[in-house]
Amino acid sequence: MNTNKRVLILTANYGNGHVQVAKTLYEQCVRLGFQHVTVSNLYQESNPIVSEVTQYLYLKSFSIGKQFYRLFYYGVDKIYNKRKFNIYFKMGNKRLGELVDEHQPDIIINTFPMIVVPEYRRRTGRVIPTFNVMTDFCLHKIWVHENVDKYYVATDYVKEKLLGIGTHPSNVK
């Protein structure tokens, strides 16, 4: 195993699972001897105010009720292809470019559904192997992109959903 590879792990503070998975991946990379491992809370670093507001709304969604939480959690798929959702494709783009320039990662691992990474690859032509460690128990469209190389899933249900939309079986673990 080449432990000189540079690993960039991206996460976000929407629920504890994404951050916990990023922390565990970091610890395992270090344990395996990787010399260059960076963890970034991309949205917090790039848009702190927007991040704080959306995190607050996310947490409030639990106390307001199931309907609001469902809208927050499942509603993303309904607006994914709409023009107004294009801003999400660009969120964190500038900071991602800075991280890539600074750390020169050989691998990017997402523990939060960030379309900005595969879109960055598409726009710049820089092909950095990108892996999504899917912490959700349902398949959101924002996890899926043609410029993601592998998906690591928590359940057979999510695996079957990915395969059902045409993801190659060798790209789902």
Task: Give names to the regions the model predicted.
Residues 106-107, 150:
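Structural motif
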Residues 24-97:
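Conserved N-terminal ligand/cofactor-binding loop architecture of enzyme catalytic domains
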Residues 12-21:
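A short, glycine/small-residue-rich beta-strand->loop->alpha-helix junction that serves as a flexible
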Residues 2-8:
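Extreme N-terminal starter segment of soluble prokaryotic enzymes
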Residues 18-19, 46-47, 116-118, 139-141, ...:
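Short, well-ordered alpha-helical microsegments
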Residues 124-173:
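Active-site-proximal region of nucleotide-activated glycan assembly enzymes
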Residues 111-114:
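Short His-centered aromatic/hydrophobic patch
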Residues 100, 104-106:
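Proline-aspartate-enriched helix->loop->beta-strand connector
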